[in-house]
Amino acid sequence: MDLHYDCAESPAAEQPSGKINKTAFKLFGKRKSGSGMPTIFGVKNKGDSKGTGKIGMVRSKTLDGLADVVLESNKKEEPCTEAGAGQLNPEKSPKVLTINADVSSNSSVAKSHSFFSLLKKNGKSENVRGEQAEQKAGSRQKRGLKGLFNSMRWSKKDKSYKDDKEGASESQPGLILPSSLTASLECIKEETQKPLCEKGKSTEDIPADVPLAEHSGDVNTSAEENSLKASEESPCSALITEQPQLEDAPLAQLQENLCQLPQPEVETLQNNKDEHVTGCGDVIADQDDDGGSSMGSKLVPGNGKKVMSKKNTNIVAYQGGGEEMASPEQVDETYVQELFSMIPPSEGASEKTEKVNGTTQASREVKCSDSAQDRNAIKPSKLKQVPVYRKERGDQNSKANEKRQCLRNSDEGYWDSPTPGQEEEEPRSVGKQALARDSCSGDALYDLYTDPDESIAKAQVEEPPLSHSHSKPLSPVTTSCPVKTASSNKESKIPISIKHLPVHTTNQGTDSSSGSATGHPHPVKSELPRTKIPVSKVLVRRVSNKAITETAAGKRAIHDPARKHH
């Protein structure tokens, strides 16, 4: 620590009072009047030992400056061995570079290493320190910023060596400093596991008894020995071989754990196979109920999600089995009771589940047949009521048909069909067959959830065109309102148009004068028999129109659908 204080105090005394940036001068030294660059990047004057000493004192925070402090104590030495020192660097640097892996990247580090090995061997000899000054000047010129920052990085670790040897002379910190720096440079060159080994080497490599005067050949051999020791890595290799053994222990434990984990997964796969065979999750549910949490205890340490997945499969299986319970109202109560009886208890096995599957399939067929029978039972009742109303109508069938078509347009809003023409007269006569054919279609399913009166009205609307299709031999014309019919009744629908109405007025003849102008009174006579059975909930309120006169009721019946359509 004394060395740092000496270096820090001397430049403060030498700097003039006008200087402000003291830290910059501590790092880069004083600026010469003739050059714009700091002297640390320049070349020292080899002849002026005083100048080198002053510049070295200014650069106190770098190891180069610390090395100059060691050299400053020997200012009296002249560069007598300058030529011999110049020959040392070119001989050492190639030998060290051959040992390094990367020649281009580590060349500067190798040069600094070779230089400090010289300082280490010749630190105590006063005659060689002048040689070190000249040699250091040449090596610093080639080293550049990389060597500078590498040396600055390890300046803090030198304090431990200095604390141990505070009572020693100035030359001994100079000896300890290069030896620790060689260790640091070797650590930079080698892998990260080597600093412990290299620190041991740095302490071991310091010679206890070194002759004061040695020749350049001895210095070369010592540099080669240091570089070879750095390449041998005998203690580090032992550590490297020991570390994989330590790492193998947790890896072996992990492998054992991984080998133990797939066992519960195999059990879950077998359970899934049983589930696929039975078609339901009853067998797995029985194992969970009887065994308690035995399966869960096996699966929780490995994968806790497996238990939840098994429970989910049970739920899905029961949903699939009880899917038929959500049936329409027409299904008998006995059918629901059969479903409850078919659900197996908790102790049921795969055979019971197969029976459940067979019974559910049979029950589906029974349901289809029952629904078809119910449909057939409803539709004959519809058709039986039609002739009664036909007798009451008498001569007004054609007008009732026209009236019904206009009224149906306001109810069935989600069916669209083009305007029928003469080519569609023949399909109208097949309306009864189409009604029986649609018992299993989507329209029939729609009728399940509608009023029975509406379905009877559909059959009633469909029956008259069978006998009165001859009253409509008209070509297609523009309709007053778009026609919307069911798929089963699409052939029996005839749109209301202005040109259709006068044709029927000629057949009736009684109301021809008013019918040709407005077309309203013609369906008036058919209003009373029509409203006995309401077509839909919208038209139920027209039952109260019985007390109204025929003309007023006809106008209201014609205008209301037109309003709703718009």
From Swiss-Prot:
Region annotated Disordered, chain positions: 120-176, 192-237, 277-307, 342-533
Protein origin, superkingdom: Eukaryota
InterPro entries for the chain: AMER (IPR019003)
Pfam entry (one): AMER
Biased composition (Polar residues): 477-489, 504-517
Keyword vocabulary terms for this entry: Cell membrane, Lipid-binding, Membrane, Wnt signaling pathway
UniProt main location, coarse: membrane
Signal peptide from the UniProt entry: none
Cell compartment(s), UniProt: Cell membrane
Keyword Membrane included in the entry's annotation: yes
Known function: Negative regulator of the canonical Wnt signaling pathway involved in neuroectodermal patterning. Acts by specifically binding phosphatidylinositol 4,5-bisphosphate (PtdIns(4,5)P2), translocating to the cell membrane and interacting with key regulators of the canonical Wnt signaling pathway, such as components of the beta-catenin destruction complex.
Name this protein carries in UniProt: APC membrane recruitment protein 2
